């Protein structure tokens, strides 16, 4: 599978079959979005919560590519009101197959208000995702969150081999909390996200790497716009 970090909390996953998933799309106005990078296909969008830096380009991409859009029930309803045709609403603990990927929605510790024309709309709750790939490998995409003890249940239930965790601090957990998340999840690799986009997001991969020294988890720091194979 090809993974491309598109800056901040946005990722593109391209499966061997060709299915393309975009996680938490924020392109327009994203200072970390790689210059010259173009999205040419989207089959699936997964949205962890309704904040602008995770949902901003969901509607434009949906109208351009007509993908299936996975989100918690209330956020999916809001997207429908904006003209998104193919929503796949769900809630925590539920699973559904989207293309070739079985998607399970998990808990997250964060807020989820959607700013719409100057008002904050209730968007349900923030969530994470477990992605069960066709080759039986498992990804955990936490979305924005703090560490929570039930990450141990995510490990127990799903055994993710690759985890995507925010480390920026201020609006999410910092490397200090993310290090505990690594210990609870026991994934082989962790890809840090949601850091460095703005000056207050001070967490850095090297700090996380130092804090989990001795743990059998590799901190895999990606470069925006540069695809990697996993």
Curated annotation (Swiss-Prot):
Q: List the Gene Ontology MF annotations in alphabetical order.
A: hydrolase activity
Any keyword Oxidoreductase? no
List the Gene3D superfamilies. Ribonuclease Z/Hydroxyacylglutathione hydrolase-like
Q: Which InterPro entries match?
A: Metallo-B-lactamas (IPR001279), RibonucZ/Hydroxyglut_hydro (IPR036866), UPF0173 (IPR022877), UPF0173_UPF0282_UlaG_hydrolase (IPR050114)
- Entry keywords, A to Z: Hydrolase
Cited SUPFAM superfamilies: Metallo-hydrolase/oxidoreductase
Q: Which family does the record assign?
A: Belongs to the UPF0173 family.
HAMAP family from the entry? Answer: UPF0173 (MF_00457)
Any idea what this protein is called?
Answer: UPF0173 metal-dependent hydrolase Acid_3917
């Amino acid at each position: 599978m090809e993974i491309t970090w598109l800056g901040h909390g946005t990722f593109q996953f391209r499966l061997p079959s060709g299915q393309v998933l975009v996680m938490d799309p924020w392109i327009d106005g994203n200072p970390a979005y790689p210059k010259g990078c173009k999205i040419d296909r989207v089959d699936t969008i997964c949205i962890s919560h309704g904040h602008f830096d995770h949902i901003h380009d969901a509607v434009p991409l949906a109208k351009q590519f007509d993908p299936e859009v996975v989100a918690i029930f209330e956020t999916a309803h809001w997207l429908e009101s904006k003209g998104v045709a193919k929503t796949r609403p769900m809630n925590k603990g539920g699973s559904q197959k989207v293309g070739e990927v079985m998607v399970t929605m998990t808990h997250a510790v964060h807020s989820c208000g959607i700013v719409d024309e100057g008002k904050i709309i209730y968007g349900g709750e923030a969530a994470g995702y477990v992605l069960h790939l066709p080759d039986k490998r498992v990804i955990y995409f936490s979305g924005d969150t703090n560490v929570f003890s039930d990450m141990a249940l995510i490990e127990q239930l799903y055994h993710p081999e690759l985890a995507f965790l925010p480390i920026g601090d201020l609006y999410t957990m910092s490397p200090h909390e993310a290090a505990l998340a690594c210990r609870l999840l026991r994934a082989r690799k962790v890809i840090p996200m949601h850091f460095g986009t703005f000056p207050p997001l001070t967490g850095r991969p090297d700090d996380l790497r130092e804090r989990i020294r001795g743990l059998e988890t590799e901190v895999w720091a990606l470069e925006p716009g540069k695809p990697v194979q996993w």
